[in-house]
Amino acid sequence: MLYAVHCFAEHFPNAFAEPRFGEHRAYWDASVCTLMSSQLFAADGVTLVGSFFVMRAQSLEQVRAFSLNDPFNKANLWKHIEVNPINVRVVNL
């Protein structure tokens, strides 16, 4: 099954400047189940508000556990993590 993971931050001015960015990136890159990742922006298209991932996994619980172990979450940078099952119909990247 595929899952969308939305990780929201209260104040996240520059993920690349965050000291744990390398650890966060390596954590998600090492996952064989991460299909896509992206930064999340506010409606203004400029203000960074978090991250978005599409993952393949056996269960919702597996994705939640993986997301909770993200170095950014362990450092309390994420205010809220939301995981939803998705059914991709069209991809035009």
Feature annotation, model-predicted:
Residues 1-93:
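Conserved, structured core segments of small domains
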